[in-house]
Each structure stands twice: as structure tokens, then as C-alpha cells.
């Protein structure tokens, strides 16, 4: 049976936390900031955790991620 490979696109977008969770960065942060308020832009800078509904699926793609 072949080795299971890490999904490289996902490996670039998610990081493991110390407690075993997955950290992600927010969308809508590359351009078109003139339509967003200062508060929206400030909150988009912060990372957030992956939701529980997506966690199992993403974890399967990141089999060998430390």
C-alpha cells in the first residue's frame, strides 16, 4: 500500500497549535480594503481556529503535519 501524502496546499494554510488544534488565517485580506471599516480590517489580521465541523476533514489532509 502506498504512503499517505500530506496535501501540500493545506499544509501551507493551516498550522498546528500546541494543544492540538488547527490555526487558520482569515480570507478577504489581500485587497479592496476601501470597502471595509477599520474594525473589520483589524479583526481580519488575527488568526482563528478551524471550526469543529471542518477539523476532521482537514486533519485527514494533514496526516504528517507536526
Swiss-Prot record:
Keyword Ribonucleoprotein appears in the UniProt entry: yes
Alphabetically ordered keywords of this record: Ribonucleoprotein, Ribosomal protein
Gene Ontology CC: cytosolic large ribosomal subunit
GO biological process: translation
InterPro entries: Ribosomal_bL35 (IPR001706), Ribosomal_bL35-like (IPR021137), Ribosomal_bL35_CS (IPR018265), Ribosomal_bL35_sf (IPR037229)
Ranges of compositional bias, category Basic residues: 1-16
MF (Gene Ontology): structural constituent of ribosome
Ranges for region Disordered: 1-21
Family: Belongs to the bacterial ribosomal protein bL35 family.
UniProt protein name: Large ribosomal subunit protein bL35
Organism in which the protein naturally occurs: Streptococcus gordonii (strain Challis / ATCC 35105 / BCRC 15272 / CH1 / DL1 / V288)
